[in-house]
Amino acid sequence: MQIREVFDRKRFVFLDGGMGTQLQARGLQPGQKPELAALEMPEVLTAIHTDYANAGADILLANTFGANAKKLTGCGHTVEEVVSASIACARKAAETTGACVALDIGPLGELLVPAGTLAFEDAYNEFAQVIRAGAAAGADLVFLETMTDLYELKAAILAARENCDLPVFTSMSFESRGRTFTGCTVESYAVTAAGLGADAVGINCSLGPKEILPFAQRLCRSVPAGVPIFVKPNAGLPNPDGSYNLDPDEFAAEMKEYAAIGVSMVGGCCGTTPAFIARLHETFSPLTPADKIPIRRSCLCTPVRFVEVGGITVVGERINPTGKKRLQQALRDGDSAYPCTQAVAQAEAGAQVLDVNAGLPGIDEAATLEQLVKDLQAVTDLPLQLDSSNPEALSRALRIYNGKPIVNSVNGEPETLEKILPLCKKYGAAVVGLALDKGGIPPTAEGRFAIAQRIVAAANAAGIPNEDIYIDCLTLTASAQQEGAVQTLEALSRCKRELGVRTVLGVSNISFGLPCRGYLNTTFLTMAMSAGLDLAIMNPNTPEMMAAVRAYRVLTSQDLQSTDYVAAYADVQIQTTQTSRSAATVAEVGAAAPGGDALFEAVRRGLKAEARAAADAALTMREPLDVVNVSLIPALDAVGDGFEKGTVFLPQLLQAATAAQAAFEAIKAKIAASGQAQGSKGKIVIATVKGDVHDIGKNIVRVILENYGYDVLDLGRDVDPERVVEAVRQTGAKLVGLSALMTTTVPNMQATIEALHAAHLDCKVMVGGAVLTPDYARDIGADYYCKDAKASADLAKQLLG
């Protein structure tokens, strides 16, 4: 078929099925790199592709899933050689049926900063190399699949968009709780990928058809009309022996439900074979894809936080240097600790979005804003409003932002619109339009509305839909232009009613120069909400203003059952005189922790600098062991418990571990200065088994275990069984952790366990990895199965203390 036919939705398009299990079944040996099949067993690889083509697959995914420089290191072949040979095999198989050939690209196998160590641009460069090779080899499209990190997916999409002109398909893998391994939601994935220009969006791997169905329904509601949706489930759920629980007939029967929800492309992933695709083809060929009716909604997001702007939404204003000497100094010094503390404090006070401004004379705004975004993403999961009119600053900040942000702002000047709107479109950002132009701010509502009309028309022409446009009719100070308040609100109402866009105001501007500013701010906020205000840029640490917002949400049925209102005020006693809560400082940051423990709270919040400062302060009054046992370990336990319950996600877990590590450095220095032995809770050896180059999960386990006080020897990835045995023998470790992500390397995990038993070493073995289950772990001889890093830490505490 022609690639353009993939998008016409006249019939279902069929993707192929599993590759790794097919290679394994046809002779791939344990430890042999699947990516080299095109060079080492080309006839076998071509035969697999041919079987899928004959089964009815319209798109054949080349065997390039792991063909990147990181995973091919030491194999003796270049990325270009492997990609070219792999696409040639798929192209040969496609000759008889006319199937399209996709350059298949999977994750790089490392977490990106801040959760890991791989820089965003380094990830981009890795993907770009593969994509250039695939385009040169004649691929028809780029297929990014099995992604779990939205940041990595963004790097891959940008690499595809900027290095070839091929269509780009994207797919993420979700766990049973409806989030990816790193905590990304279906909705955040949908709006981010579509905003970056993905031509088709889907879900693959991890689960079977029945389990993926509710997530696919959410995806269909979230992806814009015109963007096709596809699904590639596994052949059900894994059995203890590594097989899957559905046969082709059962798989096709469960898949049939997808025909009615808006999906237009179907295929299979792990465990599926040409027989599965043939049965899928028989089932879906008589059917026509149902219309997909997405919900047109205004939204902003980070991977783990999806904010739908369907009512009043609070934008924290405190990370703006105007009138804030302490923040100005922090920006000049390149000190991220203070703005990060402000971010956390605003989030806990009720902000849903954070305004971020680095516009300060005498500093490099572009570099500062870029670094500020990186630092803030490490400590908060709130979406950011990038507050700048500097195209370079916005370009750099938008590029490294993880999710869908909002840009503040453009105005009615054509020159500004021409520079900023294309950036918003490229990076999928929403945009704020200020109702002013070279003539200044019109004094009347009619004048501001006219500018708003021009901005909306220009944004639409740039490809930005109305749901991503926010108009700021501008708040003037009542002390200087008293009549301006009414004009602002009238213009706001007209924009909302007649233009069909969202609205935004900097609320606190109303009271400059007048006493008791809180009275004016709160009253104006209430008036603006009644007029249709969507985004209120304000100080969320002001109790009266947040009370007005929460009460308004109750009375307009935005806060159903008054849930949030009750949670905020159930234990509050209204007094005649109230004291205003200010943004938390290092000294105040522990107020919510047991005994007002600043170190506990700094670690819980993932604030590295504050954790170090709090540890230094605690060590002047307490013994190091007391600081560890009373503050650090309980904080890690609290974050770990949240991770288990699904209220804390992987990025926050790792940031808490990083903050704890900063505190541990202070504790170690104190112990060393005193001449005491530091000691260890116990020694643990961990490794990714022979033939497996995936070590994300293993690295996370190491970080968590180290922060609980264990001495961890990390042998790395692709580790021979003999190295593990020798390491345990030399260290005397009582616990060994083994990781495997690929089904083809699980036999090597079993071989490593058998080698440890044969050596009669006094140790227990815990295993983990995406392909493992408790039953499978038991069958290969492991003592324990650990589903995640928290489970590993719990087991270590149980066995080693």
What are these regions (language model features)?
Residues M1-G801:
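Domain-level signal for soluble alpha/beta catalytic cores
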